[in-house]
């Protein structure tokens, strides 16, 4: 008889109920809990899976390039980036009638196509690609790279090629490889590509393999580099009337510090970007060589941490014991990585629209909206995941003996103070923000809008002024013509910055008022509450006053009976589960704010946001309802249009979201009864009863039902907003 699923758990494989399938799927990636797992095999499996991950990523990016080259309109878009709509790929759908075929035939295509809102066209254009041939070449290169990584993953699972445990735990060598090898050298390579290919292309000079070694990126070649006259590389930058992609107005500089945006493309100067990557490369290549690897010189991370004791001894033993705790816990490392990557992803969202790096992307409004929203949602999931693995670390990997009186132990010791302070901050923000909104609603409802409480964000405006925004009249630092910072900025560094920050047509330091003040605090409420739930979940994961032995129950347990006063909803998993709802709601507010602020900016009616954002009805009526009108009437008895698919997705997203509640608001017993009734009916129905199943059907566990509910809630929520965002933006701006 063939071995039953799951092979990794004999106990589960022998379970006679459908629980075997669901628990098997749920624990498939929890390698630590599998039969016959050793620490070494655990590390080897994860290491090999990284190659698989890279394979999938390169295959996906290769597919993007291939489909645009095959079915897109890249060459036509390059001729007129502001008016040609970029095509992602063709659509073949047997359900399309003639009206649909006509509605989706756009961008100069011969049949129905999807428009690209990912920004890849702008990116490829900026980095020097110009023809479909370029795209095909890139696709084939990435496909080969993908195959290479797939082979590497397989290879590192073979007996002679499996790294040992000591190799995985060598922190200094890993830092050397990651900082210098991956970050440093790749940044240097990218700076090289920008200087040798992208910048010449932006000046009308076509550099490809055949002339790469003969075309000088700078007229003086390497002579200024070796003679130490590096400033020569910054002289003669592109002029403000440079026509991107041509020699008109082009300069010869390759590494500059201009600041601001290229007037025509509304994106950062390519020479500034190249300079940035070169600087990053230098910093990281040096950083990666500071640690002790083969030669007995440089820092030892363990020694640094052991020596790091706070002065005066009042803060305990500092970082003693942390090295082994972190180095022996994959969950701790993953938690740190997710937290860092989550923050970086959110920063990417903020910087992609305020400091656009790709030519013409700032004028592609739907793409700007899609990229901002996408990166904020990704950041939310990464950040919540960080706390989930932090909690698992405390349950599975934390050793109190190893960490006596160090920073970790002290966090646990004063967790009540941390949790109660977060709770206080959340309550304060919530009641005051809601109170202001509701007061303003009441005033508008009673016909006295002048009695609203409107608070100017003076501190934030002052910070904007210090960075050079003159509108508020603060006359401080960069907004003061008398300050040394202002004078240096005119010549020494970033001369283009002040023009950019005071130009109202971009998204740099947007003008803010009372509506921004309120929504800022609403978002702060969401962030603090999400953090409260996550921090409490992690700090209470080992035990709490109510349930001191919680760690014995593991990461996710539904209840521990009535004996302790009813300990349901108390596991670390439950905290994560609750936090994800808060995370999604908070990002909802963040994206609503960003999107509404920007559509009024792009349409030239910022007064609508300023006037309507100070009360809740304004948000509901003038943002959500007004912008969903095209979706609510997306297709009707009189026909359809190119927004119909988004209207359908808007409905479908609501449906998926609502299905989530079916799993969230119910009791397990109800489902078990229902399932047994259905099984009974099935067994007594002719023909149907010829089909039998081996496993006895049982209801999902409480935790599993919550997971399924949460998954539907999240997916439906994101689908709904994605359809709303893309349709309302593309419907207005084409």
Curated annotation (Swiss-Prot):
Catalysed reaction equations from the record: reduced [plastocyanin] + hnu + oxidized [2Fe-2S]-[ferredoxin] = oxidized [plastocyanin] + reduced [2Fe-2S]-[ferredoxin]
Membrane topology: Multi-pass membrane protein
Pfam families in UniProt: PsaA_PsaB (PF00223)
Lipid metabolism in keyword set: no
Binding of phylloquinone, residues: 671
Primary location: plastid
GO biological process: photosynthesis
EC nos: 1.97.1.12
Family affiliation: Belongs to the PsaA/PsaB family.
Protein name, UniProt field: Photosystem I P700 chlorophyll a apoprotein A2
Organism: Psilotum nudum (Whisk fern)
Taxonomic placement: Eukaryota, Viridiplantae, Streptophyta, Embryophyta, Tracheophyta
